[in-house]
Amino acid sequence: MTRDNNCSNSARHKLSLMGVIVTLGIVFGDIGTSPLYVMKAIVRAGNPVNVEYIIGAVSCIIWTLTLQTTVKYVLIALRADNKGEGGILALYALIRRHSRKWFYFLAIIGASTLIADGVITPSITVLSAIEGLKVYEPETPVVPIALCIVTVLFFIQQFGTNMIGKLFGPLMLLWFSMLGVLGAMHIGDYIPILQAFNPLHAIRLLTSNPEWFLILGAVFLCTTGAEALYSDLGHCGINNIRTSWAFVKIMLILNYLGQGAWIIAHVDNLTSGLNPFYAIMPHGMLFFGIVMATIAAIIASQALISGSFTIFSEAMNLKFWPRQKIKYPTDVKGQLYIPFVNMSLFILCVIVILFFKSSERMEAAYGLSITITMLMTTFLLSAYLTIRRVNRWLTLLFLIVFVGLESIFFVANMAKFMNGGWVTMLLASVMIAIMYVWYNATTIRNSQIQIRDVRESFSIISDIKNDESIPKYATNIVYLTKLGGKYDIEQKILYSIINKHPMRADHYFLLHIDYQDSPSTLEYDVTTLVPDTLYRINLRLGFRIHPLVNRYFRQIIEDMVANNEFSLASSYPSLAKHNVMGNFVFVLINRIYSTFTSFSFKERLIMDAYEWIDHLKLSMTRSLGLNTSNVLIENVPLTVKLHAKKAGNSIPRVERIEENGDFY
């Protein structure tokens, strides 16, 4: 029996007016702020800027939003949910047991490039919004103001955004409504702009213009938020996202049409640095528009930061990233805070703002990495469709169409590499390297575990328990094991109990944490191996569940006591008569990598890099949420097996299930 600790998807994600409004504030911040800079980038890429060019460019925007965002993500990707959760890592977790082993590398590349390009998002949206003040005062200190906003934004993450987050939906509803109204007001400036709905204008522009790659590089900015749309599936649900997208898309297209019509009507009077977004605003509402743009930019940035925390949390549980400290600033489910990630993103955003200094220069770097993320998602989605036995010809059509489309966008965005795109690519490369090393080193370490059948040691463990000549180490000893088989035990654990220094106790527990492919699983089973002596507990956690082992184990013990499976009473009569409970000690086996261990050349490189990265991780004790006062860490050498080739908040309940066999 499996339990998902979210309420049912139908309850959480039921289509409602309030759900749609909330979705606007969570999902569409990134894609919703694109009108701030897309048309400005298109005007700058045009040579010359004329009627045909603008109609063709707006046509490219409309059909990019239709094909890339609507068809791929809203209609197809949102159906590839992992128990209601979305995003590239959730998708990988869904298919990894049924796909090729190297698919993990696609997930690593996709997650790394998504985060790398995401560093630009807060910077470009905030800068674009603040630059509207230059209409009033050309000498406005945009960079210092943007730095102040970004600093405050990252600072408040540690306190949670539950209270102000309730305003995000209504504010984004106002923002999108403003976009649509402003655009509709100016379509009349040049009615033939409606010809942009004909895709032939887009095709004609791209096939006749030798600088098509510059145009597509600018056009692609309109859909950079599509991947975030998929990642936020678990927060809002498919029905609310699809319904709200219909409204968002209409408002976006109206705004792009209005900006395009205004540009054509004033094509002879365009000046360098002009932003059509602010140009279509009546002068009397310009200040209001700038304020709304700034608010929308902050909401978009907040969504990205929260999404980054979620991605890193998933990456940790999927063994892609070293364990980091995770905090829960509010009682809202899924709202977490990772100090290391928050500080890293803040520093990178500050560096990006100081390096580029303007949204115009930032546009030249934005979008390159996210095209790679989209390509990786396409490959994983194709694998998902294959596993689900969708018609092979439809799957092949999906693969060909979107790999072709995204490859064209990638080639177009490669023109940005020397203009700043290298910044995000460098960051993505560093993250890919860390994830690759961490995942493979973890795999190597786990492959070297020497497995024994614990049944062969039942008698000696019982004898140690009853041997009063051996000093009792603790009443209860809990060993964390990486093995999930019912009778499997690590040789190093047996060595710790029997050989190193006999670990006498009244009860021994083998606790195995099994991370599941589903996001929110929280369950356990108990097997009594030796009555009143040795127990095995398999604790299954979804990849979005933080391993608060101390709290979950305490609850499991309480359940066992309630079921008369276990007694907490001290074995010492003098303490038992005063109802003093026996103590618990957790023993963690830390396998130390030695340079003398025999590995292949590739494995040695990976393990050497792992040793360096290992300094960044949280200690085993803290990462598992254990109390340091009752934890013993035993360091043992990481040895190659003989047969190997040389070279503070409310915590959800964890539900017990009946064992249905061995779990590996």
Identify what each model region corresponds to.
Residues 2-664:
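The structured alpha-helical core of multi-pass membrane proteins
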